[in-house]
């Protein structure tokens, strides 16, 4: 059935529930788990005078790293096969790209994500994935 599961994390309580569900399914089915965290690159002004340009910083930062480390630790304690990915860009795109790369059978996400202006500009991660994923999708419902 499901042998390769992709799950997204950003360190939020909603993402933690998604990781827990991925662990539960992976344990039951003997599946490998691919943990993905996405980050937006920081834009920094470089230069001066007439020609200012933006330069992208490649480092994902400690927030993404710690989110991934916590999720990986949670799964490895259970003896699960885990691989992690920190990807630059939109969270939904990052999850779907990893799912394609590893031929995933399932993507798991929480039902809540970005809020406010960021959600308005980029859209809901669960919504985008549910409409465009290359595989089955499980949206974990959280309280609230």
Predicted regions and their residues:
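Small/aliphatic-rich secondary-structure junction motif
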Residues: 3-53, 74, 78
